[in-house]
């Protein structure tokens, strides 16, 4: 279960440097003394390349040759694919949402990002000064901005709504209670106003929060819903407000039946789409099926468990109900020492493809912005890499067709150290450990969207790994991490570098605190966001 920490991160750099014809020499033409070269050949087919291991039979040889010169980019655009218009995606029967966690907006107090709460929650100096033994509670933060004038909270929500729309999302799932001493929990009116200002078609799905857990009252939830019942931005199906509570099984299903009955008595019709902490639709159906419009689940976070997304959709449909498939990039929790191995971008891609294969009705990205656990919003540590990958899949999910690629894009995903790297046990007393699921992976991944065949190159110091891709498409190329290096990446065609990408994340041989978060970056050669 998520820990509701009231914390927050430092100056925004998006973790990527895209190199085209200008300013590339330092990275793309340096010689490699006694460089070891591994080679791999493959095609970008209909699968996403979830097994991203390098070919164990590849040959290795010494190389001191310089990288080819870089060809200037001419086919510019934000995405590798021709993204459908917002109106086209919005008209699709299938919907995509992201779970919004109110305590962690873009800014907590509208201060300079170098000295705000987010900075205090993530910098090494503040962490050590606080005397913590585990490490910082936050490893990442939203993309930053200078202090704003006027209604800065609503303006920040407007920014996030635009980001979500760019990713193909239809709305946010807002964890909601209206009475709190913490103002961050009571900003639903500002979010609703932001949706109206940016795009009246963007919707907010209510996730009533059990503030007191099993001791929560029906009256408090009913009153919360009645306060916003007439808001046009609320997500409804057939004119009925959708209620999607997280961890609803803390109370009996009769609790939720009573809420809906009371709301109906006030003229407010509603449907229930519970987001269970555990239990598939088949497990929950006996007690819940007569009360729900659909099912959802908080879900798992590893490649090997991704098929539960497909099975959940199949089970929900067999019970005559909708399914909102849980999708996540990763989950790492400094506060209690747990993480789950997501295999770079592998878990995200696997879950998305299983949701498509299972014909899920809706998607729920878990979460938009809970930076203590799992987040997908554009951020300092990942730039737009996760967001752009999601945009590709939401287009596929909604249109039923894998997007064709009209230009190239390169993205990297890797940690800042191996999972077994030495750390300072005097400052971190609880070792990070995998709670369950797939075992630890220590790879650098290049996720490439290719408009035509080409050669992919990953350079880590003197280690150069290559992969020949024989068809256009999305392909994952992953190789073992090399501590003490900062990876760089290339796409080559006809002996020339079409695109080069430099990671902003050095791979450390040893660390003060363990950091199991996957960093990321990248985009198209021009027109993309870092």
Over which residues does each language-model region extend?
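Compositionally biased, intrinsically disordered low-complexity segments
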Residues: 1, 16-19, 32, 69, ...
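N-terminal export and membrane-targeting signals
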Residues: 1-13
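Positively charged, low-complexity intrinsically disordered regions
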Residues: 3-5, 33, 40, 128
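Bacterial N-terminal signal peptides
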Residues: 10-23
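Ser/Thr-rich, Pro/Gly/Ala-heavy low-complexity intrinsically disordered linkers and tails
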Residues: 22-69
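Glycan-processing catalytic domains of CAZymes
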Residues: 67-444, 452-474, 479-530
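Extra-cytoplasmic beta-strand recognition segments
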Residues: 448
């Amino acid at each position: 279960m998520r820990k509701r920490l009231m914390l927050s991160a430092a100056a925004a750099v998006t973790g990527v440097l895209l190199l085209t014809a200008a300013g590339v020499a330092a990275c793309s033409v340096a010689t490699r003394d006694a460089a070891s070269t591994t080679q791999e050949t493959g095609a970008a087919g209909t699968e996403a390349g979830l097994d991203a291991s390098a070919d164990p039979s590849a040959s290795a040889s010494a190389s001191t040759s310089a990288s080819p010169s870089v060809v200037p980019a001419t086919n510019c655009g934000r995405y590798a694919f021709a993204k459908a218009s917002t109106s086209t995606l919005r008209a699709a029967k299938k919907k995509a949402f992201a779970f919004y966690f109110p305590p962690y907006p873009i800014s907590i107090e509208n201060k300079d990002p170098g000295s705000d709460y987010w900075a205090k929650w993530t910098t090494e100096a503040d962490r050590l000064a606080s005397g913590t033994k585990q490490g910082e509670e936050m490893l990442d933060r939203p993309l930053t901005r200078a202090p704003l004038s006027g209604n800065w909270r609503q303006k920040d929500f407007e920014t996030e709504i635009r980001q979500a729309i760019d990713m193909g999302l239809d709305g946010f799932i807002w964890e909601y209670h209206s009475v709190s001493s913490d103002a961050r929990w009571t900003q639903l009116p500002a979010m609703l106003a932001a949706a109206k200002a940016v795009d009246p078609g963007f919707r907010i799905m209510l996730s009533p929060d059990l503030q007191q857990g099993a001791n929560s009252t029906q009256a408090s939830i009913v009153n919360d819903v009645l306060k916003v019942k007439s808001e046009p931005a609320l997500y409804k199906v057939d004119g009925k407000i959708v209620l999607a509570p997280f961890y609803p099984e803390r109370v009996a299903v009769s609790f939720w039946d009573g809420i809906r009955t009371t709301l109906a008595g006030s003229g407010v019709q509603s449907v229930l789409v519970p987001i269970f902490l555990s239990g598939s639709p088949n497990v929950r159906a006996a007690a819940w099926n007569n009360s729900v419009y659909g099912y959802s689940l908080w879900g798992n976070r590893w490649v090997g468990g991704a098929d539960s997304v497909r099975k959940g959709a199949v089970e929900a449909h067999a019970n005559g109900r909708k399914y909102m498939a849980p999708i996540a990039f990763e989950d790492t929790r400094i506060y209690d020492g747990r993480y789950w191995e997501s295999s770079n971008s592998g878990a995200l891609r696997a879950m998305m493809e299983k949701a498509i294969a299972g014909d899920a009705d809706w998607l729920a990205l878990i979460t938009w912005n809970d930076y203590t656990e799992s987040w997908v919003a554009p951020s300092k540590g990942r730039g737009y890499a996760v967001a752009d990958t999601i945009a590709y899949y939401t287009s596929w999910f909604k249109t039923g067709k894998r997007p064709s690629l009209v230009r190239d894009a390169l993205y990297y995903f890797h940690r800042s150290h191996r999972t077994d790297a030495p750390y300072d046990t005097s400052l971190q007393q609880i070792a990070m450990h995998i709670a369950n699921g797939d075992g630890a992976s220590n790879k650098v991944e290049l996720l490439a969207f290719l408009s035509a065949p080409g050669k992919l190159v990953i350079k880590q110091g003197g280690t150069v790994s290559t992969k020949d891709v024989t068809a256009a498409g999305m392909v994952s190329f992953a190789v073992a991490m090399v501590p003490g290096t900062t990876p760089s990446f290339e796409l080559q065609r006809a002996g020339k570098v079409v695109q080069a990408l430099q990671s902003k994340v050095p791979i450390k041989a040893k660390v003060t605190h363990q950091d199991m978060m996957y960093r990321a970056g990248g985009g198209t050669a021009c027109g993309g966001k870092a």
